[in-house]
């Protein structure tokens, strides 16, 4: 029997796409007014679940109920989409229209030929006052910040009568203060009966917001944890069980080396008077509430921005050329498994891409290839003859980090290391970074989401409006 308060029920779901089982025996029940956290240990089945929620993708087995109505099963599938809203990095608002048009007209609330914008303004102000925001009704959608856009989508979902809202990795692109304001709005609408599924790979974030947390692995829910006393410890124990890792000792207790990178009053098109000192073997995280500083650091490290003022010193020696051309500096891009590998090159050519030019000799290159195979096969396995396209994500990350190790830099810039990655991949990335730190290579992590704070970081510098706020 289903509870009368049930908003969504997924019973023993099995969903297969392109011959691969995406959801298998998936069981989940969400109640009206509940904030359900969803943490995926790996990414398998998450996108398929979102598609199932919205568009009733045909299933091989099981039943889906929405507002106590059967909407999908292996026998029957409703052709119309469910009134379920997904809020993520991709905008679902219509550019060229105002906030009021999106919230009241496109949501289907107003069906009259003549629309009274004054009434829109009053109703929007009531909603905004309840959740603590102030967005003008006549403001164009393309002028909204990321936080304002998320809030408008949430207000639109409420006005359209949606009973369930899915928020997908919100903390990856919203600043820390904005996350707190969004959580306040979520709690407000939950108190009025709206249900939420909050997808995040940070258990700290989920524990601070959700009533329950569902842990998903390989397309199945393996645990649903009530957020009562002891809940957080149970989640930690489960993570250790699946990852086979224990908590790392605090990096702050480890000895520091000498300063290997020093930015002294550095100015570029996006950076203004930035001072920064990074020690040999140190992991330093730089957190900013907007992407301007992050973009400026990336453009500086990759040589896309010229130095307009100040000095960049490595091991006390100033560099007079772009950092990207200096062998002592390496850069790992956001989503490197897609951005930093050459699909048409062999594994070994990708691996040795950053080595000096003296391996251009065919005989020299073949000797290096044999040596690398012999040294790395026990650690990496039989990956050297694989096509790059056939590598899994963890193998691609291992390839990228071994390439960096072969380059032997003094400092590595790593942008958004956890962006969009599942829990198991995050653990793998941490192990790869530890390889760099063990070689006394400094790692500078650039992050936007406050819950992406890197566990290995000895220090975290928090910037606001381009200025250092705290350390």
Predicted regions and their residues:
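Conserved beta-strand
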Residues: 11-15, 21-31, 62, 261-282, ...
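A short, surface-exposed alpha-helical micro-motif characterized by mixed small hydrophobic
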Residues: 206-208, 453-455
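Conserved ABC transporter NBD signature motif
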Residues: 61-71, 80-82, 309-327
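Q-loop/switch helix immediately C-terminal to the Walker
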Residues: 90, 95-109, 335, 343-361
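The feature captures the beta-strand-to-loop junction immediately N-terminal to the Walker
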Residues: 39-42, 287-291
């Amino acid at each position: 029997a289903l509870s009368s308060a049930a908003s969504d029920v997924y019973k023993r779901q099995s969903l297969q796409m392109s011959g691969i089982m995406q959801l298998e025996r998936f069981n989940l029940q969400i109640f009206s007014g509940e904030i359900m956290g969803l943490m995926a240990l790996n990414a398998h089945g998450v996108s398929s679940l979102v598609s199932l929620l919205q568009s009733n993708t045909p299933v091989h087995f099981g039943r889906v109920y929405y507002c106590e109505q059967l909407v999908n099963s292996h026998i029957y599938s409703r052709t119309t989409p469910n009134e379920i809203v997904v809020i993520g990095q991709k905008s679902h608002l219509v550019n060229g229209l105002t906030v009021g048009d999106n919230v009241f007209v496109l949501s289907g609330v107003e069906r009259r030929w003549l629309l009274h914008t004054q009434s829109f303004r009053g109703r929007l102000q009531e909603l905004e006052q309840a959740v603590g925001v102030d967005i003008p009704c006549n403001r164009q959608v393309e002028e909204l910040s990321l936080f304002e856009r998320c809030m408008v989508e949430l207000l639109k979902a409420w006005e359209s009568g949606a009973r369930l809202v899915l928020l997908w990795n919100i903390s990856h692109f919203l600043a820390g203060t904005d996350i707190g304001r969004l959580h306040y709005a979520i709690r407000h609408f939950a108190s009025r009966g709206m249900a939420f599924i909050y997808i995040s790979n940070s258990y700290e974030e989920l524990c601070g917001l959700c009533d329950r947390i569902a842990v998903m692995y390989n397309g199945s829910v393996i645990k649903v944890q009530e957020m009562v006393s002891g809940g957080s410890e149970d989640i930690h124990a489960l993570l250790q069980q699946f990852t086979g890792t224990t908590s790392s000792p605090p990096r702050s207790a480890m000895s520091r080396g000498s300063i290997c990178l020093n930015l002294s009053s550095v100015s570029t098109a996006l950076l203004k008077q930035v001072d920064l000192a990074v020690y040999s073997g140190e992991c330093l995280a730089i957190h900013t509430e907007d992407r301007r500083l992050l973009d400026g650091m990336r453009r500086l490290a990759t040589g896309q921005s010229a130095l307009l003022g100040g000095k960049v010193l490595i091991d006390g020696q100033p560099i007079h050329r772009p950092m990207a051309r200096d062998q002592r500096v390496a850069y790992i891009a956001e989503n490197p498994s897609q951005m930093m590998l050459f699909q048409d090159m062999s594994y070994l050519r990708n691996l040795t891409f950053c080595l000096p030019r003296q391996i251009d000799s065919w005989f020299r290159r073949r000797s290096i290839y044999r040596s690398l195979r012999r040294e790395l096969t026990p650690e990496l396995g039989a990956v050297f003859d694989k096509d790059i396209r056939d590598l899994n994500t963890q193998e691609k990350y291992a390839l990228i980090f071994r390439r960096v190790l072969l380059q032997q830099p003094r400092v590595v810039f790593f942008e958004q290391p956890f962006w969009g990655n599942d829990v198991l991949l995050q653990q793998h990335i941490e192990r790869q970074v530890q390889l760099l730190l063990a070689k006394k290579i400094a790692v500078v992590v650039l992050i936007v989401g406050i819950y992406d704070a890197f566990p290995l970081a000895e220090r975290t510098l928090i910037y606001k409006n381009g200025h250092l706020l705290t350390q």
